[in-house]
Amino acid sequence: MKSVIIQGLFCGFLAIGLWASMLLLFLHLEQEDMLENEKEELLKKRSLGKNAHQQTRHSEDVTHDEVNFSDPELIQGLRRYGLNAIMSRRLGIEREVPDSRDKICQQKHYPFNLPTASIIICFYNEEFNTLLRAVSSVVNLSPQHLLEEIILVDDMSEFDDLKDKLDYYLEIFRGKVKLIRNKKREGLIRSKMIGASRASGDILVFLDSHCEVNRVWLEPLLHAIAKDHKMVVCPIIDVINELTLDYMAAPIVRGAFDWNLNLRWDNVFAYELDGPEGPSTPIRSPAMTGGIFAINRHYFNELGQYDNGMDICGGENVELSLRIWMCGGQLFILPCSRVGYNSKALSQHRRANQSALSRNLLRVVHVWLDEYKGNFFLQRPSLTYVSCGNISERVELRKRLGCKSFQWYLDNIFPELEPFNTERKRKKNRF
């Protein structure tokens, strides 16, 4: 009797196990079918060989409802991604944005034979649709013969939809996108260097993972560098609102910074645009944002890439800006190239990087500011005795490149940056 009961229990457990296995298999196959159907539907909408200069409209009309700030899902998305994830899902992986270029820019034509571009996009825990919109906009709005590749560098993202699901969706782009997954957290700066090391295009174009390019965005960048391989160029950075995700045109500005080494945008005066090129005139810029710019691949390597001793992100934009100008290059903003950017002001990731940012800025100060470093410490006295690590390699790089002094940079590139109390200011006050 006892053996019969045991046999019955064994058979029962076996049946339950088989049933559970079949259920899991069914759910897995159902999920695969759903993803396959979604992918097939998206493939029907896309043809990489057609309409290279036109962006495909999303199939559904998106209505921008009033933002409900009490919605727990909205708050969760802001905390998790730094943007309105509800609206992002509603927009999907591609959309049409307004052409924010001046009419003069819209009438410009560029040579067919330009250098090829490798687009490098690094991401960490990015919202899925936001990342795919960045990729889709590049594919849809870039001439295919100039687009060598898009290199995505995943810096050990933790979100599930950035793993197998992302791999699956990237098949839509038919091999145009290469995905690199870091084996450990490297931070944005080193991730960019990893992406650049795998690039094969003539020009490296760095983009953030939460941006969307506009019409004829790539050609002006490539054309400028084709004329001077030591010219580094940036687009005008339009605004994507983190709550509504509306795309808004930005005015023509130049990059600058203060003695905290914080990037700021300075207005360009109307008389500077009075020449024959009008509002399409390239703008000489003392500094640039770190996330969106184009540079000749060989020149990037010759110039020393990024400072490998910097962590995560922050400060690398000022460091590279100084190195470009002081070591024989030029930095310009091109009004005819437009890229929208979501600043994600509420992002937890940005708030968590203050320690790394301070260390990065100290490396800039001790390598590049010469006798003017005291102006930084007047603003940030708490960092006076903080270590910035070993900078001997970067000091040697500056010597090897034959770079000019920071005094030269202030006199010739950025005279608007007034020192607080230095010999330069005392000399100026004598006259």
Swiss-Prot record:
Signal peptide: none
Cell location: Late endosome membrane
Transmembrane segments: 5-27
Function: Probable inactive glycosyltransferase required during spermatid development. May participate in protein loading into the acrosomes and accumulation of ubiquitin-proteasome systems around the head-tail coupling apparatus region.
Glycosylated residues in this chain: N68, N353, N390
Membrane topology, record value: Single-pass type II membrane protein
Annotated protein name in UniProt: Inactive polypeptide N-acetylgalactosaminyltransferase-like protein 5
Stretches for region Catalytic subdomain B: 282-344
Family, similarity comment: Belongs to the glycosyltransferase 2 family. GalNAc-T subfamily.
Gene Ontology annotations for the cellular component aspect, listed alphabetically: late endosome membrane
Domain statement: There are two conserved domains in the glycosyltransferase region: the N-terminal domain (domain A, also called GT1 motif), which is probably involved in manganese coordination and substrate binding and the C-terminal domain (domain B, also called Gal/GalNAc-T motif), which is probably involved in catalytic reaction and UDP-Gal binding.
Organism: Mus musculus
Major subcellular location class: membrane
Positions of region (Catalytic subdomain A): 114-224
Pfam families to which the protein is assigned, alphabetical: Glycos_transf_2
Gene3D superfamilies linked to this entry: Spore Coat Polysaccharide Biosynthesis Protein SpsA, Chain A
Topological domain spans for side Lumenal: 28-431
GO BP annotation list: spermatid development
GO molecular function, one term: metal ion binding
Tissues where this protein is expressed: Expressed in testis. Mainly expressed in the round and elongated spermatids during spermiogenesis, not in the outermost cells of the seminiferous tubules, which contain spermatogonia and somatic Sertoli cells. Present in the juxtanuclear space in the round spermatids, not in the acrosomal vesicles. In the elongating spermatids, localizes strongly in the acroplaxome, the region between the developing acrosome and nucleus. During differentiation, also weakly detected in the transient manchette containing microtubules.
